[in-house]
Amino acid sequence: MWAVLHKRKLSSSRIILFGFAGVILVGTMLLMLPFATKTGQGAPFGDALFTATSAVCVTGLIVQDTASYWSAFGQSVILLMIQIGGMGVITVAAAITMASGRKISLMQRSTMQDAISAPQVGGIVRFTGFILKGILLFELLGALVLMTVFIPEFGLKGIWLAVFHSISAFCNAGFDLMGTKSPYSSLTSYADHPVVNITIMLLIVIGGIGFLTWQDIRQNGIHWGRYRMQSKVILATTGILLLIPAIYFFFFEFSAEPMERRILLSLFQSVTPRTAGFNTADLTALSETGQTLTIGLMLIGGSPGSTAGGMKTTTAAVLIACAIAIFRRRENGRFFGRRIADDTVKNALTVFLMYISLFLLGGMIISRVENLPILTCLFETASAIGTVGLTLGITPGLHLISKLILISLMFLGRIGGLTLIFATLSANKNTLSKLPLEKITVG
């Protein structure tokens, strides 16, 4: 399919868009097969499409419990879609091409660069190989650690559970197979289990900081000054977005819990909105403030060039840096002694406005259609567009139009706002002439 799309001379953005759409379509058809469900009847088109979109877009929102509804075949299809979605369709296509010994063209290398947010085309094949090795290594290590918990509890089935949850966590998907204990229960039965909590949290964070950040850490170790500005911004922002919410949850949401459980719940609840979707606490029991904070974290999401979705940590950081620059009457925003490029600011503002607008619009429509509280619906749309998967429990009972809204938001959230814009709009080639400049008073 990759070669066919390139032969049609499509832009990188359109190849990425059609690539994800193609995998979703194939996954939908596979999930509709009779042996994909435990009833032997196959899933209805709407449920299959929703599940396939959620898996490929590594979201985790579900309309049927994964463990109790889908057969072993159906679960395997879902896991494969999670892996493809987490790695990226183009990265998977590149891996297949490299494994077959075929040469990757310059145009294909350019598409790979856009797909993984690499700074340059040079060395892109080697960098892709580094990404693939890293993904397999972290997922394997995560599975081995989880096996020490799941095999004693579930027997040999624990091997499958460990592999499934390791891949789902690393790819920031949030799909789980714990519905055999209680449908839609996620990881609530392991809320006070340190091994499960720490392993899942580490996989989520590592998968969500971005492949370029991996490379910086590998090459430069503890030498912070040698890191790219982007890696510094990602690591600093990630640290802040993990620490501050954890402190809030510790003091205001889980204060009645025993100390060890309280610490684990607080940490997990600050990590999982970073587009993972697992939960160890009952989210409906959170206060409205806690739910609103979670919505904000879900919208920000992970970092560019990672397995995570959302508007990205760098987008939030750039906008905050520019606001600070305005307060201090500086011409440009700054990070670590470097100015932020004007194009970066424009892109960040465009992404922010697109995500906020669609998040609000989707929430208002669902609230009207379903006659549900607006905060509950905004929680759902933030989870979808941030490709998170956390829910207040309303997803399975939504009407078709509400599910279609969530499907659209999940797809946009995974491919990215700018990718969608570039894929659907033609570039303006008239760059030589400029219109007259006139100032407008704002604020």
Identify the meaning behind each predicted range.
Residues M1-G443:
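Membrane-proximal intracellular helices of multi-pass ion channels
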